[in-house]
């Protein structure tokens, strides 16, 4: 049998007794200082619930399924998703600057189809992946034209734009945006974009809004962006 010892949160005394309940949670009263409180404070319970919500968001669960699993209100889950849409800290370099100058990196680029609201409203996810470390170093959402790709290219750090070979498929937007002397377009089946295509599959397994035939789709671009950001951040953290 396991016995749990509780102490007063104010004076630290072990002489406490049960004193009713509040919203289904047992209360206690300290016989030394007469302080009343909960054995498990609400902040601790909410922190555990929010940690569970954050874990479920990165495991292909919809908002309503998380409500059924955790009992957390759907509006609270939506607030957690919007909070996760804040800018992420930059990825730390895995090698020194001197080592980066000696050896060129290899980046793989690809685009991933998704939709917002209805299937006719297409939104493409553009990814930039380091081949050696298999981490996502850049991404953006938009159409399949040149504008989102140009925005993504300009947002990449300078050492990626100057000292990298760029392997892509033969989609026409890449040839118009990427530098010709760095760009290496490859036909389907060549295997030069196998890493980024495998990461596309991993993201579809982790993020429900990227699944082709799913009821877990986003109704707004802001929520769509936030859900994808959660999936990408969690993927990079697992490397």
Q: For each of these PLM feature ranges, what is it?
A:
Residues 1-239:
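Residue-level recognition of single "structural anchor" positions
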């Amino acid at each position: 049998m396991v016995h749990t010892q509780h102490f007063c949160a104010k004076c630290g005394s072990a002489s406490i007794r049960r004193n009713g309940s509040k919203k289904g949670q047992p209360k206690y009263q300290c016989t030394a200082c007469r302080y009343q409180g909960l054995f498990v404070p609400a902040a601790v319970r909410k922190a555990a619930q929010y940690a569970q919500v954050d874990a479920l968001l990165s495991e292909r669960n919809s908002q309503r399924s998380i409500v059924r699993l955790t009992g957390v209100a759907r509006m609270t889950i939506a607030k957690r998703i919007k909070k996760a849409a804040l800018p992420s800290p930059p990825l730390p370099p895995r090698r020194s600057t001197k080592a980066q100058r000696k050896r060129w990196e290899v980046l793989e680029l690809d685009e991933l189809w998704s939709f917002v609201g209805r299937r006719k409203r297409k939104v493409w996810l553009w990814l930039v992946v380091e081949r050696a470390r298999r981490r996502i170093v850049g991404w953006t959402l938009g159409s399949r034209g040149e504008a989102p790709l140009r925005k993504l290219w300009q947002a990449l750090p300078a050492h990626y734009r100057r000292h990298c070979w760029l392997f892509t498929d033969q989609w026409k937007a890449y040839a118009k945006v990427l530098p010709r002397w760095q760009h290496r377009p490859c036909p389907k089946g060549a295997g030069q974009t196998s890493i980024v295509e495998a990461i596309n599959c991993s993201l579809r397994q982790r993020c429900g809004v990227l699944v082709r035939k799913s009821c877990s789709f986003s109704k707004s671009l802001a929520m769509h962006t936030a859900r994808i950001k959660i999936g990408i951040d969690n993927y990079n953290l697992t490397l």
